[in-house]
């Protein structure tokens, strides 16, 4: 069994927080990109589209690696049932809280913004269910996926731990070439599964819950397990934290391929399958790029960084409806895309931080948006003198 590191992994905490916060410029730039979203500017911006594609190509892949790393660390700290309970509470409670408080009002707002409120009663029962699945889960999808992954990893992590007890992990060697081949095969395997589903029963791919619970989990699970393995094997972790020109160059070429597929691919052909293969290896190489960069520049303790590490989940949860509100009611009055983008950042981040500070002063909200019980200090229990 692995000992839990005594020293805090500051750079991983920081990377995870900044990847979460990157969701803000990602969604604001989506308004000004050429991609169709709930709300869009009158004219798309080429550079903001490129910026949006860059963030989207790797952000959640690296995020799930870090999630797997910390998840296995906690797996060794707690008994199995307590580990599952703690992990599910910390992601499940904020998700269930955000649905009635954030994504439901967001859905109602969009119904009127997009002029769909009047047609809602005419939808079939299934269409209403599926629309609500997509719209209420919305940007919370990764929390649902983490709940599913945690449940699956009750068995997977047990198998990994049992195998480690019967093998010598010090002799386990990894190389980026071998990992690249493995992830290329995983990408091809995922593409085959998706294409098979598309041929056999294509409507299921547009089902929101199937997409989140099955397809997204299936795609991101290898990165989650990779994070756990990086915690177990120091050599693998060192492979990611050591700068590699080869990974940087390969990631750049893969991103170009990603853009070409976005530009010339067709959803009715092989665009989504090709994207899964490209992003699977791109995500692996970007783990090295991001980890090595973060290890060099972010591996320190800072009160300011700690503040945003603690605030990142709450800010991410509330930013999405704020972004859509900005896009629906403020964007049409700003003619410059770049000015609108900057104003959007100030608007969303500013209000999100204010809401974060307010929620810290309300114990119930603090618990609901973190999933962590409020611990009273001993001196709070002491009688006044």
UniProtKB/Swiss-Prot annotation:
The cross-references to InterPro entries, in alphabetical order and at most eight, read: Acyl_transf_3_dom, Glucan_succinyl_AcylTrfase, Glucans_biosynth_C
What are the entry keywords? Acyltransferase, Cell membrane, Membrane, Transferase, Transmembrane, Transmembrane helix
Q: In which pathway does it act?
A: Glycan metabolism; osmoregulated periplasmic glucan (OPG) biosynthesis
Q: Which GO terms describe its molecular function?
A: acyltransferase activity, transferring groups other than amino-acyl groups; transferase activity, transferring one-carbon groups
- Listed EC numbers: 2.1.-.-
Q: Which domain of life is it from?
A: Bacteria
GO BP, one example?
Answer: glucan biosynthetic process
Membrane topology of this protein: Multi-pass membrane protein
Q: What's one Pfam family here? A: Acyl_transf_3
Where in the cell is the protein located? Cell membrane
Please give the GO cellular component terms listed in this UniProt entry.
Answer: plasma membrane
Transmembrane regions listed in the UniProt entry: 17-37, 60-80, 91-111, 137-157, 173-193, 212-232, 239-259, 274-294, 311-331, 338-358
Where primarily located? membrane
Of which family is this protein a member? Belongs to the acyltransferase 3 family. OpgC subfamily.
Q: What does this protein do?
A: Necessary for the succinyl substitution of periplasmic glucans. Could catalyze the transfer of succinyl residues from the cytoplasmic side of the membrane to the nascent glucan backbones on the periplasmic side of the membrane.
Protein name, as recorded? Glucans biosynthesis protein C
This chain's source organism reads Shigella boydii serotype 18 (strain CDC 3083-94 / BS512)
Q: What is the lineage of its organism?
A: Bacteria, Pseudomonadati, Pseudomonadota, Gammaproteobacteria, Enterobacterales
> Encoded by which gene?
mdoC
